[in-house]
Amino acid sequence: MAAAVAGPLAAGGEEAAASVSLPGSPGLPGSRSAERALEEAVATGTLNLSNRRLKHFPRGAARSYDLSDITQADLSRNRFPEVPEAACQLVSLEGLSLYHNCLKCLNPALGNLTALTYLNLSRNQLSSLPPYICQLPLRVLIISNNKLGALPPDISTLGSLRQLDVSSNELQSLPVELCSLRSLRDLNVRRNQLSTLPDELGDLPLVRLDFSCNRISRIPVSFCRLRHLQVVLLDSNPLQSPPAQICLKGKLHIFKYLTMEAGRRGAALGDLVPSRPPSFSPCPAEDLFPGRRYDGGLDSGFHSVDSGSKRWSGNESTDDFSELSFRISELARDPRGPRQPREDGAGDGDLEQIDFIDSHVPGEDEDRSAAEEQLPSELSLVAGDVEKPSSSRREEPAGEERRRPDTLQLWQERERKQQQQSGGWGSPRKDSVLKRGIRAAGAGASAPSTQATCNGPPKSSTTQLGVSGGQGAPTPPPTSQDPLPVSGPVTAPVPRPLGSIQRPNSFLFRSSSQSGSSPSSPESVLRPRPFPQEKELISQLRQVLESRLQQPLPEDLAEALANGVLLCQLANQLRPRSVPFIHVPSPAVPKLSALKSRKNVESFLEACRKMGVPEADLCSPSDLLRGTAQGLQTVLEAVILVGGKAPLPVQPSSGLGGFLLFYVVFMLLLYVVYTRLLGS
């Protein structure tokens, strides 16, 4: 092997490094510095000949060294007009950097490097990418700052490619074959002449995408399927869809817009989800590129090369070739271990992140935490102590946890106890709704074999779907005095879908229900029917608000008032500038968050205090957010006290009928007396 490597080195030509000095050591001959670099290469397996202004490989100095075990070679910042033949004979080479040379074409002998996983050809003068480069087992290919006019169709054969950087070239379009690279995580096409992006890019498992400084006017709607994307750079483009004001807000709003646009065009989101790639193990960005920051910053400006050409050197992400640059090849030798399976058996491909606003956003986490302040910190059960859920169960997302059948009964029980303790208007109604929902859920189920006792250990219960004749009596419905039975740790019979069960009026169940059985809003299905007195109160309040605000109100008045926008407008109509700031929905985000809704409601209550509404007549912000009768009564009393144009809801008096009868008889007598006086 040593002879095979030393042969090309001694094939002829002059030794260019004989009179070159090592940077920082002006008195050291070039041959001595090259010899020292070769000695270190034999000892470490890494050949570093960077920044030496070499035009030819030092063949004479390499004649006496065995370079067959070299795995990394750094030939950057030199003046090589072509790839050295000696470098193409290092068959064990895994990483090769030819950054910042004068290459105008590539040596076909590069196809001999069958172990090469990293290739850096940036900042050269290449006008095309030969097909034999696409036959290498590359994981990282960097060819930025060249003169490429197109990518070859053979690029689809790079099945192991994870990072592709073709920035600062002359590309006018991307081939469709690029979208078949199922391992691609990082795609950089910055500073080209692209006018469109392929729709098929939405099927790639990209973690980072940079298409800034191009001519792109429309982002494909299919990009909403990029569920692993963490960084997207799209500045300096004449974007029209999404609009500029949405793009300035960040990635989350962009993907929200794309999802809504897909719905408007008739391509339902459910039709887009099956076309996503199958479940795979995504590679985090910190594993691929440790220590890197995707800040997209520019350097000081133009940079000149030996050929005299000048090109802009912006966004050069891999200018320096160091030990960290070969991390990809290390990952190839030491792959990551298998991922731990989920306890509930769900795979990665089963969880579809449809709404990008709901996850990985610190600001939204604050909204969610503020809304959850209304809930008790622990769940309390009536039928004795029950084991708490496991730690892995607590780590699951709140929305997924509430959808699970085994915890639905716990949430219902907690809601029922909370309503009993609050003593608010409508609590008995919610209890009855709860019990009817559970009774309907267990209509087709037989009695459980065992029940948990108050003092004994919890026992598991089995549920049989369907009723077999003569085997086991059906479970009697719970009465209003008895608590709901809890059997086992957290098990409950669920023979019907969760959407068919009426649940109490709580924001927990509003957020967890994504679709209802009727075309109306899901919240309208979950809200219990009001009492007759509450109906009369809602009707009277609707008339007052419509006359005050001069606009029609939706049918679900309590839900319309829950975000506090109409309440703040009403306060400003009663007394101008009583609420100086109102949070209103935007076209991109049509529904206010829980935190903003609560701020609106608190501003309305504060305005009521300033207008003279007694503190005893005011309700809590949670009453208005939940749309209870006490909250509606507060709104009506504020209008009556300040506006004075609406009567208070009074019960019909028992003596009203007698007074009317007396009045009619008295007027009749007066009429008779008057007629007789006129007749006489």
Curated annotation (Swiss-Prot):
Induction: Expression is inhibited by LPS. SMART domains: CH (SM00033), LRR_BAC (SM00364), LRR_TYP (SM00369). Residues 1-22, 440-453, 510-528 have a biased composition (Low complexity). It is a single-pass membrane protein. InterPro entries: CH_dom, CH_dom_sf, Leu-rich_rpt, Leu-rich_rpt_typical-subtyp, LRR_dom_sf, LRR_domain-containing. Residues 346-355 have a biased composition (Acidic residues). PANTHER family: LEUCINE RICH REPEATS AND CALPONIN HOMOLOGY DOMAIN CONTAINING 4, PTHR48051. This is Leucine-rich repeat and calponin homology domain-containing protein 4. It comes from Mus musculus. The gene is Lrch4.
